[in-house]
Amino acid sequence: HWKPLFLVAFTATFFPGFFFAFAVSQIDSSVSAILNSLTPLITMLIGFFFFGFSFSRRQVFGVFVGLVGTLLLIVKSAEINPHQHYEYALLIFLSSIGYAYSLNMIKTKLSDLDALSITVSCFAVLMLPALLVLVFSGFFNDLVWTSKASESLFYVSLLAIVGTAMAKVLFNRLVQIS
């Protein structure tokens, strides 16, 4: 299971985290959220073409309605904010592809593992790369160790561990039972 876990870890967590951070520095977060709503459509397309899934007409219609809404919101946003760097939207699109790919991988290749095992394994795979990014980003050099900074770091860490990890466990379980 390590190969699918490795792929799921990087496509669903590692790269999208950075892609979103870079993208929202250049485009509105609302645009990134709208673009991220393409994930169900991309999930269906990847599932159909690469994993052999079939879908009901109702499912396809629902995703199509969502796509039309997404396109309308993107066009309106571009009219309202024409001076943004919309080429960064490609990073959001790549994240959606990563999410879609990982959803299909969890459903097909990791369905025999429980959701907690998938989550723990993915975060274990990402520990070293994430630590390397943290070290080489200058985080430890730039951090001023005060009581407020330590407290803030504690709460961010708590949010990451409790919020993100628990959400990933629940999400992985929902993917498995869908």
Regions found by a protein language model. Give the residues of each.
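Hydrophobic transmembrane alpha-helices of multi-pass small-molecule transport proteins
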Residues: 46, 55-77, 96, 130
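Membrane-interface helix caps of multi-pass small-molecule transporters
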Residues: 18, 22, 26, 45-54, ...
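Structural signature of hydrophobic alpha-helical transmembrane segments
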Residues: 22-40, 85-98, 151-161
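Specific transmembrane alpha-helical segments of multi-pass solute transporters/efflux pumps
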Residues: 1-36, 72, 160-178
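Hydrophobic alpha-helical transmembrane segments in multi-pass integral membrane proteins
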Residues: 15-22, 71-81, 126-142
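Hydrophobic alpha-helical transmembrane segments of multi-pass integral membrane proteins
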Residues: 7, 58-68, 87-91, 105-162
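Residues that define the loop-to-transmembrane-helix transition and helix capping
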Residues: 3, 30, 56, 116-117
